[in-house]
């Protein structure tokens, strides 16, 4: 059995294949995902698992050099924005319109669906390098 934090086989596989500048998205239960993007559906109930639980888990194994958030999170979900900034205090943030984020999902290695039920709880993680 795998000993590291990410034990979901699909999620672990995607993280293992990430290269520099590749993107992985984590999002709420309502985010529409293009059919061309792999969807790893972890949602089992409202709020389970939460966005932050999944983000924290992924960050145990993925080197992130930049994050992308919807501009709308600033007004519509400031608590989540604060939590993300606290978890990634030194990571540059680029804010983009939510509609642009939805389009950008087509360029992600995968989208990880959580059970999160709060607005604009979506993030694009840009992979960095560990050297």
From Swiss-Prot:
Q: Where is the active site?
A: 20 (proton donor)
Describe which pathway this protein belongs to, using the record's wording: Carbohydrate metabolism; D-ribose degradation; D-ribose 5-phosphate from beta-D-ribopyranose: step 1/2
Which GO molecular function entries does the Swiss-Prot or TrEMBL record give?
D-ribose pyranase activity; intramolecular lyase activity; monosaccharide binding
Keywords (A to Z) from UniProt: Carbohydrate metabolism, Cytoplasm, Isomerase
Q: Provide the residue positions that the database annotates as binding substrate.
A: 28, 98, 120-122
| EC number, UniProt record | 5.4.99.62
Q: Which cysteines are joined by disulfide bonds?
A: none
* SUBUNIT field: Homodecamer.
Q: Which family does it belong to?
A: Belongs to the RbsD / FucU family. RbsD subfamily.
In UniProt terms, what function does this protein have? Catalyzes the interconversion of beta-pyran and beta-furan forms of D-ribose.
Record-given protein name:
D-ribose pyranase
**Species assigned in the record:** Lactiplantibacillus plantarum (strain ATCC BAA-793 / NCIMB 8826 / WCFS1)
Question: Upper taxonomic classification of the species?
Answer: Bacteria, Bacillati, Bacillota, Bacilli, Lactobacillales
